[in-house]
């Protein structure tokens, strides 16, 4: 068993929204690792970061991603930072991985000052998002077999393009 597709991308790229719509369009189940982490921990991601720190969160996330990649047959939406894990990047090899690309400006517009996103909280949001993208963009590109820009495109249009690409 393997997922039909795995979505990756930075905060605000549309992983959850596109994931839901793509799963619906393909009549497949969706597995959102951020939701699964919160369900497993019984707390929000922000609470895990505050109470246990990023390393504890990443360890839990890595295990949930592993289970999803090994057993879920639908669409899997990964948390934005999951690709920081070398183990996760290894697990993604051989799978259809869709990188939802977004500009820093659009990402900031979509995420704003969302405190549910602990790595973007506090300080200068533009600087934090730019630095996050500087670190992660090469990793997203490394794991991606399909890249699609989401800037200025409706979720419906992005899903339409992805359905066509997945049918190729």
UniProtKB/Swiss-Prot annotation:
Alphabetized Gene3D superfamilies for the sequence: P-loop containing nucleotide triphosphate hydrolases
Record bears the keyword Amino-acid biosynthesis: yes
Any single Gene Ontology cellular-component annotation: cytosol
CDD domains the UniProt entry points to: SK (cd00464)
PROSITE patterns xref list: SHIKIMATE_KINASE
Example of a GO biological process term: amino acid biosynthetic process
Binding site for Mg(2+): 16
Cofactor: binding details: Binds 1 Mg(2+) ion per subunit.
Domain of life of the source: Bacteria
Pathway entry: Metabolic intermediate biosynthesis; chorismate biosynthesis; chorismate from D-erythrose 4-phosphate and phosphoenolpyruvate: step 5/7
Recorded GO MF terms: ATP binding; magnesium ion binding; shikimate kinase activity
Residue numbers binding ATP: 12-17, 117, 153
EC number: 2.7.1.71
Cofactor: Mg(2+)
Enzyme class: transferase
Record has Magnesium as a keyword: yes
Catalyses which reaction(s): shikimate + ATP = 3-phosphoshikimate + ADP + H(+)
Oligomeric form and interacting partners: Monomer.
Similarity section: Belongs to the shikimate kinase family.
Listed name of the protein: Shikimate kinase
Protein species of origin: Rhodococcus jostii (strain RHA1)
Organism taxonomic ancestry: Bacteria, Bacillati, Actinomycetota, Actinomycetes, Mycobacteriales
């Amino acid at each position: 068993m393997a997922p039909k597709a795995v979505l990756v991308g930075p905060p605000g790229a549309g992983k959850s929204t596109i994931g839901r719509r793509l799963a619906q369009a393909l009549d497949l189940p969706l597995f959102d690792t951020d939701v699964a982490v919160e369900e497993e921990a019984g707390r929000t991601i922000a609470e895990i970061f505050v109470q246990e720190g990023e390393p504890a969160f990443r360890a839990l996330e890595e295990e949930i991603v592993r289970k999803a990649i090994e057993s879920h047959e639908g669409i899997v939406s990964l948390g934005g930072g999951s690709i920081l894990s070398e183990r996760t990047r290894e697990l993604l090899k051989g799978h259809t991985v869709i990188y939802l690309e977004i500009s820093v400006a659009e990402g900031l517009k979509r995420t704003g000052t969302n405190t549910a996103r602990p790595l973007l909280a506090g300080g200068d949001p533009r600087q934090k998002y730019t630095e996050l993208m500087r670190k992660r963009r090469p990793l997203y590109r490394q794991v991606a077999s399909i890249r699609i820009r989401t800037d200025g495109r409706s979720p419906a249009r992005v899903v339409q393009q992805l359905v066509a690409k997945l049918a190729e």
